[in-house]
Amino acid sequence: MFVSPPPATSKNQVLQRRPLESTNSNHGFASSLQAIPENTMSGSDNASFQSLPLSMSSSQSTTSSRRENFVNAPPEYTDRARDEIKKRLLASSPSRRSHHSSSMHSASRRSSVAESGSLLSDNASSYQSSIFSAPSTVHTQLTNDSSFSEFPNHKLITRVSLDEALPKTFYDMYSPDILLADPSNILCNGRPKFTKRELLDWDLNDIRSLLIVEKLRPEWGNQLPEVITVGDNMPQFRLQLLPLYSSDETIIATLVHSDLYMEANLDYEFKLTSAKYTVATARKRHEHITGRNEAVMNLSKPEWRNIIENYLLNIAVEAQCRFDFKQRCSEYKKWKLQQSNLKRPDMPPPSIIPRKNSTETKSLLKKALLKNIQLKNPNNNLDELMMRSSAATNQQGKNKVSLSKEEKATIWSQCQAQVYQRLGLDWQPDSVS
């Protein structure tokens, strides 16, 4: 009966890792395998088969010696070694860390392969895995820590150009209902059409409103950079911070002290009143959306932008109305002056015109006065004297042309109505008292 040798399977490898009682049992196992008749297989097969027990015996004896010489380290030494290795990894550069991790990982792989047949391979692999079990995880953690720790070493941006300071996209500043309602109402820059107004210096101050940001960019650090413009005649620009989670007082103060329409020289009281009204309206709308009354509004980006644009529109309309009012008042004064200086026929003053009974009414005093005037001005006749007197009177009247309160109130109301109608606003002009 032919008996074949057991195949070298994983089961056989597991059996090799089981502890052996003594060296004699190894020889017994080898002798039992050698008892197979030689005539049942060829010579080459027999030679290779006889060499198998010898290699297994030598491998098992080597493993036994390694087991006797191996000493398990106490847990505190293991933890201390692990901490020391981590410290060295953190102190090394990223390239050295990756090279060190790969070399240690390959070394651990070679060690596990060399000791695959040993009885203590499981213990050794578990000891190695406790330190280098997840090199990718350690590398990821080191990368994150190094990126955070190395960022302050980079030079922070303290000066930016106007193009770099302005936002590149605007889709998060407006609700989807506005952006998706009618594509024809969207400008080429992605903003709605109502952000473009035919008002005095609107484009300039719209750019200034876009420089109000809700958060700092990472490359700015903890401070707002300076906006650089080219040219001496360029207007002033600066970045302002207004977080989404801000109190009403912070929002009002930021709007009032902004650079919006600084050239119009609007009075502080008007800007403060306009900012308070804008924030109060936004609070009512926020409470209607959220259904709760918050001490500090946690605004969304569209709500936040809506507050800025409403305040900008209020002061822009006021600046436009005041500009139109000054022009209308100047034009009205010129018209009144022209009406008062209409050309009249060249006639002497009424006191000089002789009456019908001049011979009876003229006194000697009047005759003497007229004679003295003619004697003092022998080269000028009476008509020239009358024209000089009329010119002096007109010059005095020109300096005294003014408008009454009723006239100013009427002109102001007309300017407001024209601006509101031109912009399509349903606002009501101030009533004339």
UniProtKB/Swiss-Prot annotation:
Q: Where is the composition biased (Basic and acidic residues)?
A: 77-87
Region listing for Disordered, in residue ranges: 1-117
Ranges of compositional bias, category Low complexity: 48-64
Q: Which GO terms describe its biological process?
A: D-glucose transmembrane transport; signal transduction
Give the coiled coil ranges. Answer: none
Assigned protein family: To yeast STD1/MSN3.
Q: Would you tell me the protein name for this molecule?
A: Protein MTH1
Q: Which gene encodes it?
A: MTH1
